[in-house]
Amino acid sequence: MTDSDNPRRVLLKLSGEAFGGGKVGIDTQVIRRIAEEIVPAVQQGVQVAIVVGGGNFFRGAELQQAGIDRSRGDYMGMLGTVMNCLALQDFLEQEGQATRVQTAITMGQVAEPYIPLKAIRHLEKGRVVIFGAGAGMPYFSTDTVSIQRSLEIHCDEVLMGKNGVDGVYTADPRKDENAKRFETLSYNRALVDNLAVMDASALSMARDNKKRIRVFGLEEPGNVTRALVGDEIGTLVSTAESRVAE
């Protein structure tokens, strides 16, 4: 599925909500299924890095509304991402897949520090690398981190796994029955129309560096594998003209 001389390298972004199954904490069945779908892609030669969110535990912006200092709330969210990283690492290793966690905040007993060249070396050896603790700084979303990490470790594509939708639509498909799914979507259209791809700062970084983003639905069985190996599912956000599915 991938050229051994030029292997496909991707970054998979998973939201904290995906890990929680819509609830606080982690849904082990969901994480196990995601792990089971990652392994076949790695076995086909795809190099897989992952950024996970922490929204199933804490969200800094929401904690701020409750009176908690925004920076402190963001750090709480970063620690939540590390719990998700360790859970996913465990399920991947249960499947026999060597996995490393690297965190932007040093915590030597549970993870390696984030070192880009070391991460690349792990990927080249067939290990999955999971990045935790966001950027290690407040006010940076895990969407922004996913673009930044993908640029630093030279990924071909960023894959955004979404719950509840199978791509990016012209309007909210849950509210508008006439909403159509984009097959391709330009960065500018996504930004101007405020379409639900990722936050604006992350999308601007992707546009400025021409980093392709594929948005796909997480809930369809097998979709994670399909996205990782390069199947054209969901919506591709790039410099190409926007086009809706027929």
Curated annotation (Swiss-Prot):
Its EC number is 2.7.4.22. It catalyses: UMP + ATP = UDP + ADP. Its main location: cytoplasm. ATP binds at residues 13-16, 55, 59, 163, 169, 172. Keywords: ATP-binding, Cytoplasm, Kinase, Nucleotide-binding, Pyrimidine biosynthesis, Transferase. One of its GO terms (molecular function) is ATP binding. Pfam families: AA_kinase. Pathway: Pyrimidine metabolism; CTP biosynthesis via de novo pathway; UDP from UMP (UMPK route): step 1/1. The keyword Manganese does not apply. Inhibited by UTP. It comes from the Bacteria. PANTHER family: URIDYLATE KINASE, URIDYLATE KINASE PUMPKIN, CHLOROPLASTIC. This is Uridylate kinase. It comes from Bifidobacterium longum (strain NCC 2705). The lineage of its organism: Bacteria, Bacillati, Actinomycetota, Actinomycetes, Bifidobacteriales. The gene is pyrH.
